[in-house]
C-alpha cells in the first residue's frame, strides 16, 4: 500500500512529461512537413501559381495566427477545388494547416486586395520557417 501511494505521483509526472514531449515533437513534424511542401510548391513552374487569391495576410492587426492559417486554408481549398493543378500538394498543405488553424474564420473577398498563389505560398513559407525556429 505504501509503494502504491509513492508510485502514483511518479507515474503522473512521467505522463505529463511525455505528453509535453509528444506535443512539441508533433509541432516539429507538422511544421517540417508544411515547409517541405511549400518548398516543393514554390519551386514549381506552373500556371496555377499565378492564380489570383485574396491577400489573407492583409488582415487587421488583431487577427490571430490561428485565424490567419484558417484564412490561408480557405484560399487553398478554393484553388484546389476549382482547378486541377497542384491538388495533391495544396490538399496536403491544407490538411496540415488545419491542425494549426482555428476552426472558423472568414475571408471577405470583396474587401481584400488580391495576390497570386505563389506570393501567398512564399509568405506562408517565411512565416512557417520563423515558427519552426521557435518550436
Curated annotation (Swiss-Prot):
Disulfide bonds: 27-135, 48-85, 70-105
Glycosylation sites: 62
PROSITE patterns according to UniProt: INTERLEUKIN_4_13
One protein family per Pfam: IL4
UniProt record, GO biological process: B cell activation; cell surface receptor signaling pathway via JAK-STAT; immune response; interleukin-4-mediated signaling pathway; macrophage activation; myeloid dendritic cell differentiation; negative regulation of apoptotic process; negative regulation of cellular response to transforming growth factor beta stimulus
Classification via Gene3D superfamilies: 1.20.1250.10
Main location: secreted
Signal keyword on record: yes
Compartmental location: Secreted
GO cellular component terms given for this protein: extracellular space
Classification via InterPro entries: 4_helix_cytokine-like_core (IPR009079), IL-4 (IPR002354), IL-4/IL-13 (IPR001325), IL-4/IL-13_CS (IPR018096)
Function noted in UniProt: Participates in at least several B-cell activation processes as well as of other cell types. It is a costimulator of DNA-synthesis. It induces the expression of class II MHC molecules on resting B-cells. It enhances both secretion and cell surface expression of IgE and IgG1. It also regulates the expression of the low affinity Fc receptor for IgE (CD23) on both lymphocytes and monocytes. Positively regulates IL31RA expression in macrophages. Stimulates autophagy in dendritic cells by interfering with mTORC1 signaling and through the induction of RUFY4.
Family the entry assigns: Belongs to the IL-4/IL-13 family.
Protein name: Interleukin-4
Organism: Bos taurus (Bovine)
Lineage of producing organism: Eukaryota, Metazoa, Chordata, Craniata, Vertebrata
Amino acid at each position: 500500500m505504501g509503494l502504491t501511494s509513492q508510485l502514483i505521483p511518479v507515474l503522473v509526472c512521467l505522463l505529463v512529461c511525455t505528453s509535453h514531449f509528444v506535443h512539441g515533437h508533433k509541432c516539429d513534424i507538422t511544421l517540417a512537413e508544411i515547409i517541405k511542401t511549400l518548398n516543393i510548391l514554390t519551386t514549381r513552374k506552373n500556371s496555377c501559381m499565378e492564380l489570383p487569391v485574396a491577400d489573407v495576410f492583409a488582415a487587421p492587426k488583431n487577427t490571430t495566427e490561428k485565424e490567419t492559417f484558417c484564412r490561408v486554408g480557405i484560399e487553398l481549398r478554393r484553388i484546389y477545388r476549382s482547378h486541377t493543378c497542384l491538388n495533391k500538394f495544396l490538399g496536403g498543405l491544407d490538411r496540415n494547416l488545419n491542425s494549426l488553424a482555428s476552426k472558423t474564420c472568414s475571408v471577405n473577398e470583396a474587401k481584400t486586395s488580391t495576390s497570386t498563389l505563389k506570393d501567398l505560398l512564399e509568405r506562408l513559407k517565411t512565416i512557417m520557417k520563423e515558427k519552426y525556429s521557435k518550436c
